[in-house]
């Protein structure tokens, strides 16, 4: 009986270690051509950044998700999920396209930070993160209510 338990324990440990090794080594980040992006991502770039060219594009495959990152010639970084929906846009010193900013967030920023532009916009599971040109970061919940201001 002891021998059988030892064999079962050894088998479980071996399978566990093999699964952990696969999980650890599965991260696959590599450059790709712009044409390999999902159609939605290509359309987003064409619609909102037609005056810019793509500097480089990468795909990051993990066990649970696939993400794409695009860097434009002006330094703007855009992240897309596996279906091509944008997750974040970081323009650093330039303003993000107004068309992608939810109207309630755009209105709040204009009313409270009139001279500032939105330079970073992230969609999060719980809401939105907004980076302003004055260095402030604002967080909004999914109903577009301000929940946090971080400097």
Please describe what each predicted stretch is.
Residues 25-151:
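Interaction-mediating elements
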Residues 1-26, 45:
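Bacterial Sec-dependent N-terminal signal peptides
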